[in-house]
């Protein structure tokens, strides 16, 4: 465990200099943007519309590097509708240096607001920050639609044993937490004050949930609950290498949000455990960085993979999650068709 040193001061200084963010930018990237570069997706539904938020395109072709938004009414056909911000917030550039894109958003709804956590990071280092933006609605046509930049949540740098990327909020019966992390110590967990969306100063410790030595270090974590257990999904291996990516998704479970999490064989995830949920299959290379959409008895796992039939392009995919008699998740067939891929690809 590790305490968040001087984070409250950093957050206060940054937030005091941040103006409210503008509405989503005008879609760019042409007609193919709806399927181009979907990485690190996070899905939610408002009304009859599903929304997927995903990492900004580092090439700037789609959305100029900002968090992308796509919508669907049926989970199969998706339309790119713009970005959360018109540009990367200047305070992030001042904190982590020049970066081409924002990473790995996580969208949730509580206390009357949509909370979007996301990261800015210098690739290959742990000079990173997790930030928060809020909105009262996701309906881009609503006059109430407006993203407010709430500033920094967790930051990291040389000397820290964690990397402040890949945020994922989880709410328990009486507490709220944020999972995050990657290389530099694996998956961490910090208590969140739901009134602010920021770390709870009465519980300032950073807890450790999962750790494996490179090259199979975990990142892209997500926690959901089912039938008395909390399930921790993580991606192991390497992302971001197209068809050379080695990502796969593994899972462990615990009776408590804070762990310890173990796999189906009882191996602790802090000791490299994890039961495989998804691996490479035909044209689907490096599946990972997934999140779980949960509504009633429905569980959907949304993730990205690299399309071997299209030069390793990053694609969105969604599958139903089902549960075995022993309480472990398994995935159903893919829901999202990808142009140019054989039937069932993804």
Task: List the model feature ranges, each with a label.
Residues 24-346:
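Carbohydrate-active catalytic/glycan-binding domains of CAZyme proteins
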Residues 1-24:
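Secretory targeting and sorting signals
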